[in-house]
From Swiss-Prot:
Protein known as: Glycerol-3-phosphate acyltransferase
Entries under InterPro entries matching the protein: GPAT/DHAPAT, GPAT/DHAPAT_C, GPAT/DHAPAT_LPLAT, GPAT_PlsB, Plipid/glycerol_acylTrfase
Organism, scientific name: Pseudoalteromonas translucida (strain TAC 125)
Signal peptide (residue range): none
Catalytic activity: sn-glycerol 3-phosphate + an acyl-CoA = a 1-acyl-sn-glycero-3-phosphate + CoA
Domain of life: Bacteria
Keyword Lyase: no
Entries under NCBIfam families matching the protein: plsB (TIGR03703), PRK04974.1 (NF003441)
Length: 812
């Protein structure tokens, strides 16, 4: 029998070498899980298959792990390392013989109990052939090639058709000491071990492939049979005086417009195309904090990805990154503007479902869409949508649109069993493809519709776009959020009717803000946005190379030692390496003279660079405010710095979606300034190091906030110098003054006089009770007056004089 087994293993290994290409996750399992190849090692898998064993053996050899085909010495015993929970069924019949897994588990546990040895590694390994979720009603191809437990004959077809898409995921070794320490019947422990493994593999399969897919016809029929849509069809027939059949047909048309038509084959094709595209466009894609998603899937959570929206490239980048992490691509809420030929069909088969900008006046559409979204959650599909609603044209986060999040919570009120978690995602680029279009739109040009010609133009202009960045933020469990903030939320659960309790709106708005905060917590610094921070505050947007490198080193050390959040990622390269990389992107001019090199932003890029600076300006808000104060005062105290930050931080927090202020943050910033020899700290007293280099560094850092503080001064100035001003007048006059100030002082940043930004700031002042409604209009509080005096001390005299002259002239 041993000879037969040996021959079969050799044969399967040969076939594996010819036909199988395995993708392994994590990429370095030995480092990720601190695996020790010298420790006793076992691999527990779902299926006892020779092809699975052969594929695993090749991967283990590549990563320096013990061979799963060999036996492991454990005490006086020799045990098979490969533990398969289930045997494949025979060629004829459905009942498979039981495996030796239970006996193997018992032998391992008996050894642990008798010897006390704690270094035994039992590693769960998920092995999948292809990532197709399967059909609820299998077709011929499914019967031949796809089965969780195929016979050896069907397994040949599986390897033949899906061998190039073999997927192997190692998981954290099972903590057997916890299992052994439990006060349970010793005889039950092996069964519990296998039960834990089965649950794990079921969740891993669901995370990698998603639930089984119904046919489009099945999906539509189930949706049309729901009580909610039935009632909406009846209402449609009455309202439009048409027959039930016509109203039903209208609902079918809407479903065809909305519903995704997910195809794993399309995903595979797209994955290969996107791999080629990224290599053409980018020098690499940096992806961070993926382990959080795997923790959620291991716990059986449904996931909602909520990224910021910089570019149409986001759709591709995030889906690609998720797929490469061994997770099923989410169903993506895409604007109806993207449903054009042929892109619409490609997006739809890649998991996109389409949403109109407004549901207003169309009750049938609203009912159909909400029911479709509810079914996605009920069936267990992951979903992705952009909480900003559209792409940011300025580089800063847009105020969240809460419609999709509200519908998500309403779906939860249908009584979904599984927990649902939101994963905020920060996306950043060193070059945004649409940046020139954004600038034109901010200048007042009409937004152009999407078309296939735009895509061809983008592809034609393929060039070096630097690096892309994708950071997964801290997850938010919606269930836990509601438990904490709305403890009685389960009282409103109804299995069929769409619920809209009074608490829904406020809780959705608050949750949306938390998502935005966590997106900004996970921001990514890169060469372009850091250089934008430095060069945009300098005359002519240029700086000598030595000073530029010194300032870049200052910022890198500041962000590494006194980071706003532990999720912020900073480049690991040296300033010199970052500058060399940035110069290859054709965004900078290098001017040489007898004194050395000067680095300047290319003329055509100067206004565009405000976009990249806005991506990370929030990370420098507090350091910049402190630096500006230090530069102006030269001598101050820690207490005054804390008071200044306390005055402005609520305004910053609303504008940039910042988390609650951590007092330790100010301490860490000042400590970093001390370490970089910018200040001297003597108890509460701070003295600036009075050297030219020190002054220049603090001046450049402080200037990063200039435009923001000038906007504040414009709005607050009108309020403080009037006896009351109407909101509409305040908005209008503030925009006019901002435009005038821009002309006087050469400010070309589009959002400086963007009405939306000014209106948002005024709304924030009201929300924080810094302004209130009086008989004559808006009036300021005492606290606002104090903020106004702080602004007067911080802003340059010539700028303050320009603001003061115009404000006082207008308010006479």
């Amino acid at each position: 029998m041993r000879i037969v087994n040996y021959c079969l293993n050799v044969l399967s290994a040969g076939v594996s070498r010819l036909l199988v290409r395995s993708k392994v996750l994590p990429e370095k399992p030995t480092e990720q899980y601190e695996l020790n190849s010298k420790n006793p090692t076992f691999y527990i898998v779902r299926l006892n298959s020779r092809f699975d064993l052969a594929a695993l053996a090749r991967v283990c050899k590549r990563h320096g792990l013990p061979d799963p085909r060999e036996q492991q010495v454990l005490g006086t015993q020799r045990l098979d390392r490969f533990i398969g929970i289930e045997n494949p069924p025979p060629l004829i019949g459905d009942i498979a013989k039981p495996t030796n897994a239970l006996a193997q588990g018992k032998q391992i546990i008996d050894h642990l109990l008798s010897s006390g040895q704690k270094d035994v590694q039992v590693i769960p390994v998920t092995i999948l052939w292809g990532r197709a979720p399967g059909k609820e009603k299998p077709g011929l191809s499914t019967l031949i090639t796809h089965s969780l437990t195929p016979s050896w004959f069907r397994k040949l077809f599986v390897v033949l058709f899906s061998g190039r898409d073999n997927f192997i995921r190692f998981s954290q070794p099972l903590d057997l000491s916890l299992l052994v320490d439990e006060k349970a019947d010793v005889n039950e422990l092996p069964q519990k071990l296998l039960r834990v493994a089965r649950v794990h593999f079921r969740r891993q399969k669901l995370a990698a492939t998603g639930p089984k897919m119904p046919s489009r016809e099945q999906l539509f029929n189930s949706l049309l049979a729901s009580p909610t849509i039935k009632k909406a069809i009846q209402d449609e027939a009455k309202a439009k005086n048409i027959s039930q059949a016509q109203a039903r047909q209208n609902a079918v048309k809407l479903l065809n417009e909305i519903a995704a038509n997910y195809s794993e084959a399309m995903i595979r094709v797209a994955e290969r195309f996107l791999t080629w595209l990224w290599n053409k466009l980018y020098n690499g894609i940096d992806i961070k904090y993926t382990e959080q998603i795997h923790e959620l899937t291991n716990k059986g959570h449904e996931i909602i990805y909520m990224p910021c929206h910089r570019s149409h490239m986001d759709y591709l980048l995030l889906t690609y990154a998720i797929y490469h992490q061994g997770l099923v691509p989410p169903h993506i809420a895409a604007g109806i503007n993207l449903n054009f030929f042929p892109a619409g069909g490609i997006f739809r088969r890649s998991g996109a479902f389409f949403i109109r900008r407004s549901f207003a006046g169309n009750k049938l559409y609203s009912a159909v869409f909400k029911e479709y979204l509810s079914q996605l959650f009920i069936k267990g599909y992951s979903v992705k949508f952009y909480t900003e609603g559209g792409r940011s044209r300025t580089g800063r986060l847009l105020p969240p649109k809460t419609g999709m999040l509200a519908m998500t919570m309403q779906a939860m009120l249908r009584g979904i069993d599984r927990p649902i978690s939101i994963v905020p995602v920060y996306i950043g680029y060193e070059h945004v493809m649409e940046i020139n279009t954004y600038l034109k739109e901010l200048a007042g040009n009409d937004k152009k519709g999407e078309s296939i010609f735009g895509i061809f133009k983008a592809i034609k202009n393929l060039k070096n776009y630097g690096r892309g960045y994708l950071n997964f933020g801290d997850p938010i469990s919606i269930n836990q959020y509601l438990n904490d903030n709305q403890p009685n939320w389960r009282d409103d659960i109804h299995p069929t009717d769409v619920q809209k309790p009074q608490w829904l709106g406020p809780q959705v708005a608050n949750l949306a803000d938390q998502v935005m905060v966590k997106i900004n917590n996970a921001a990514a610094l890169n060469a372009v946005n850091l250089l934008a921070m430095i060069l945009l505050v300098n005359d002519k947007h240029a700086l000598s190379k030595p000073k530029l490198l010194a300032q870049l080193d200052f910022y890198l050390r500041l962000q590494r030692d006194a980071s706003y959040s532990n999720k912020v990622t900073a480049p690991e390269e040296t300033p010199e390496q970052l500058l060399t990389h940035a110069l290859k992107l054709n965004k900078f001019d290098v001017i040489s003279d007898e004194f050395g090199e000067i680095i300047a932003i290319n003329d055509k890029e100067k206004t565009l660079f405000n976009y990249y600076r806005n991506n990370i300006l929030h990370l420098f808000a507090v350091p910049s405010l402190i630096a500006l104060h230090l530069f102006r005062e030269k001598t101050t105290t820690v207490s005054k710095c804390q008071q200044l930050v306390a005055a402005f931080y609520p305004l910053f927090a609303k504008e940039w979606y910042l988390r609650e202020l951590d007092e330790d943050y100010i301490t860490r910033i000042l400590a970093n300034f001390v370490d970089q020899n910018l200040i001297e700290l003597d108890g509460d007293n701070i003295h600036i190091t009075n050297t030219n280099d020190c002054l220049a560094k603090l001046d450049m850092l402080g200037k990063a906030l200039n435009f923001t503080l000038q906007r504040y001064a414009i709005v607050i100035g009108f309020i403080q110098t009037s006896n009351g001003i109407e909101k509409a007048e305040l908005e209008r006059e503030s925009q006019v003054l901002a435009q005038r100030l821009g002309t006087l002082h050469g400010i070309k940043t589009p959002e400086f006089f963007d009405k939306k930004v000014l209106v948002s700031f005024i709304d924030n002042l009201r929300a924080q009770s810094l302004i209130t409604d009086g008989d004559a209009g808006l009036i300021g509080s005492v606290q606002l007056c104090e903020t106004y005096m702080h602004l007067k001390a911080l802003l340059p005299a010539r700028v303050w004089q320009s603001i003061s002259d115009i404000v006082q002239g207008q308010c006479k």
